[in-house]
Amino acid sequence: MNLQTPTVRSLIFIDELMVEGTSKGNHMTIAVLLKQVPDTTAKISVIGGRVDENAVSKWSFSPYDEYALESALQLKESAGGEIVAITAGPARCEKLLRDAAAVGADTLVHVSAENINDFDSIQVQNLLAAAVQKSGASVVFCGKQAADTNAGSTGPGVAELIGASCVTLVSEVSSDGGGYTATRPSSAGHEKVAVSAPCVFAFDKGICEMRRPNVRGIMMAKKKPIETWSVEDLGVDIGANGVNIDSHSPPAEKPPGQKFEGADSVSTVVSKLRDEANVI
């Protein structure tokens, strides 16, 4: 399978716009693309110009992917179908899949790529697009961007590679059985975009928060099998790396705060808040 570099193109949506797609039957299979990133509360260490992954204390879902997963679960509950959770990366990413299974994902797919941090965005998109096609899904949910890179290219890139319609900045998706309607922000408030499969939805923060697993869900997730696919299994040529990151650098540390005690310091505190912090 040879997947080519996606063509960059702009899509402008208007209220009640219908984008034609190709239907693949009544059974709905939703592929949810998930990325494991350092938790927003985890301390990041940089050694030799690279993030030290061994020092990351906690890994979690990329936040926008949580909205995509929860929206897929709600669509499954209202319209039926099944959810295939797909992630690409090293072995530690399997925990992410089990977390997805604990809240309702039906099939778990781990695309094994220990060196995925050496891939550029297009290589990752080629990998994910091949996994989506192998899964048989005609509908794809993902976050609008990853919390670690903020690239925002996965949704449009995968859509281009699999020949699907793409709607970005989505907050909600519904289905009437014959197509899908996505809600997204507009200059006038909100707009509804109607599409048919195959289609890709890239989610912004929506009206729903990620549900928490119950004990039964957690126990069942531990037993659920994970399908592991290699790059060779997918039969895809991901191409050469076209973008190399020279180095990472942490932000400058904030200066230590100042502490004041006693009534005699009130005038000093007020002066600093007014003249330095500009908050009063």
Residue ranges and their predicted role:
Residues S10-H27:
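Short, Lys/Arg-enriched N-terminal segments with co-localized hydrophobic residues
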Residues K24-I280:
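N-terminal glycine-rich FAD/FM-binding segment characteristic of electron-transfer flavoproteins
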